[in-house]
Regions:
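Long, low-complexity, polar and repeat-rich extracellular regions
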Residues: 1-176
Length: 176
């Protein structure tokens, strides 16, 4: 899927469900906001073996207004730089926290931001994340990361709620 702006795939209502498997998504802003996967208004996206490539200023995976995104197997998110938004939730008054769950081998170049949402990353062996993290704990939101035989190259100041490591490395030297 190639998106020259807006989004690659989106679930925009409470009855909307998008199921994807073995899919590559490339997002180019063309001057406006662009998102690889976008769930909102109670929409739900499930994905298995996805690759998302985002141009500068794009967002990889984004959930808002009580929506949910569940991803399994291999997940590649390659933003233009590690400070770009790879995975994020957004708080909106009057809505329950949105949820993003990912479990599998992950290659992430970009940051993970839990802003009023719940993000759970279960990184299987061979996973590499280069970027930063933020959890603002608004609306009951949190960011939990489990890493097994994986590497996180921390590129800037970061915080999260839970970090469980098994034979994994958190490389603070990547922060410049």
């Amino acid at each position: 899927i190639f998106s020259g702006g807006s989004y690659g795939a989106s679930a925009q209502t409470a009855t909307a469900v998008v199921n994807m498997q073995n899919t590559d998504i490339t997002v180019d802003r063309n001057g406006s906001l662009a998102l690889g996967l976008w769930a909102l208004s109670g929409g739900r996206i499930t994905g298995d073996s996805l690759a998302i490539t985002g141009a500068a200023g794009a967002r990889g995976i984004y959930a808002m207004t009580n929506s949910q995104i569940d991803l399994t197997s291999d997940l590649v998110i390659d933003m233009s730089t590690p400070d770009q938004m790879a995975i994020a939730t957004q708080h909106d008054d009057g809505y329950a926290a949105s949820r993003i769950n990912a479990s599998g081998r992950m290659l992430i170049n970009g940051s993970v931001l839990s802003k009023g949402g719940l993000i759970n990353l279960d990184m299987h062996p061979g996973s590499v994340w280069t970027g930063s993290s933020l959890s603002d704990n608004v609306n009951g939101g949190k960011l939990d990361v489990t890493m097994n035989n994986s590497v996180w190259n921390v590129t800037s100041n970061s915080n999260l709620d839970t970090l469980a490591l098994s034979h994994s490395t958190v490389d603070f030297a990547s922060h410049t």
